[in-house]
């Protein structure tokens, strides 16, 4: 490390730079800290035993890794670039890890890429985000290398807004943060099947989450979500399913229970963030459990918050 730097003021320097791009999200300090960091660095990592033993950070680096870049408070510029060919975090093995943070122009740009190695194969992850004008555009790509394909792309733009709702409102009172997330149209592959994610919008405002027509489909099959997620019992979110394979959920969650079947029908949830009340009435075609076929079934389900359990009333036809 060469140059002028202070560990005490470095976090404030980073926030000062990022505030230029998303000022509605990162507010100024009540007591501004003077920062004069101007340095560059080139670090080579061979052994991380100190992190594990002294700081209790469960990281082990297996090969030569590097972190390099520069920081200039006066020019309001930074760049941090890291390469980690092979490491372990807790029980997760990471290969070909790379991250980059920089602001060469009118955007703050972040990129992260790695492979999560598992016994059944590897999952490749690539995340990219650009911040500018109180907005963050994020793209996530992933893909696996096992016999059954799970891969795809998620993309969204988050807009951060703080505005005075009333003309006579005190200027000293901080306006609440409102976040508008525009979900972009993309595709994902689940169990070798191509699904479409359609444009939709999610709004976070005053402690509530408004979901406006989230729509996920493959031909005639679909999942649609509308409603309000909040702590209040009068706010309800509705899910409409048509021939959705419930096996997707159990495959991804890896719960050790193998349910199969195609679900059609509505599901409702209210007061989700505090005392959730949930109910569903589904018709499941070819319901199966742990490789055994139970037949078609009509299922009424309820979440009982007092006992934190699920009540199911299922009637099946073989």
Task: Give residue ranges: language-model regions.
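Interface amphipathic segments
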Residues: 1-318
